[in-house]
UniProtKB/Swiss-Prot annotation:
InterPro entries: MobA-like_NTP_Trfase, Molybde_CF_guanTrfase, Nucleotide-diphossugar_trans. This is Probable molybdenum cofactor guanylyltransferase. One of its GO terms (biological process) is Mo-molybdopterin cofactor biosynthetic process. Pfam families: NTP_transf_3 (PF12804). The keyword Cytoplasm applies. Belongs to the MobA family. It comes from Methanosarcina acetivorans (strain ATCC 35395 / DSM 2834 / JCM 12185 / C2A).
Length: 225
């Protein structure tokens, strides 16, 4: 699906986003979490609206053609935007395979990566991460007190592809393994991010209906499974 976004052939200085939507939603009865609807919009629609404030294209990483077909009706609401799909080629490799497939599909040097069940991704924070990553290998949020990270809410350069291949060759699939193998990663402290998003809703993901209720209040009767 393409639109007004003008991207030259090959790699450009544009910004891409990779949305990892291939999860099976086991904790929600195998539903497509990206299609959960509350307050009149699906999670995917909310996510795309936020991302397109700061990126030129979005790549949806999905598991197969049937899942792609389920998501297509949402994409029809974005006729003038560049949205493409990519598919895993390795089975049971987790989100790292989705990132690999997305980076291969991306037309940009830098891509923001997030999960498909994150309805409140903050475009200002995505913009901040792109600015921090510029000229480096990646920009990764870090919880400074306990040294934990947000690898599925980060900006990565194409340099990560080589490290991902090395990770798979070593029979590992942790997202942080190739991140730490890169030499020039910028860590963005959560305290700085909190200055933009005090409640840190940008990191929130949906695993259960209760998660939605806790984030936006009672939505009983509004959630369509």
């Amino acid at each position: 699906m393409s639109g007004k976004t003008e991207l030259k052939p090959g790699r450009t200085k544009s910004r891409s986003a990779i949305v990892l939507a291939g999860g099976r939603g086991r904790r929600m009865g195998m539903v497509e979490k990206a299609l959960l609807e509350f307050e009149g919009k699906t999670i995917l629609e909310r996510l795309l609206e936020n991302l397109f404030r700061v990126v030129d294209e979005v790549i949806l990483s999905v598991r197969d053609i049937p899942q792609k077909e389920k998501l297509l009706p949402v994409l029809e609401k974005f006729p003038d935007r560049e949205i493409r799909f990519c598919f895993d080629s390795r089975e049971d490799a987790g989100p790292l395979e989705g990132i690999r497939a997305g980076l291969l599909e991306s037309r940009s040097e830098y891509s923001f990566v997030c999960a498909g069940d994150m309805p409140f991704v903050n475009s200002e924070i995505v913009d901040l991460l792109f600015e921090k990553a510029n000229g480096h290998d990646a920009a990764l949020p870090r919880w400074e007190e306990d040294r934990m990270y947000e690898p599925l809410h980060a900006v990565y350069s194409r340099k990560m592809l080589l490290e991902i291949e090395k990770t798979f060759e070593g029979e590992r699939n942790s997202v942080l393994t190739p991140v730490f193998a890169m030499k020039d990663v910028v860590f963005v402290e959560v305290s700085e991010i909190r200055g933009i998003d005090p409640e840190l809703r940008t990191f929130a993901n949906i695993n259960t209906v209760e998660d939605i209720e806790s984030m936006i209040g009672s939505v009983v009767g509004k959630v369509e499974l």
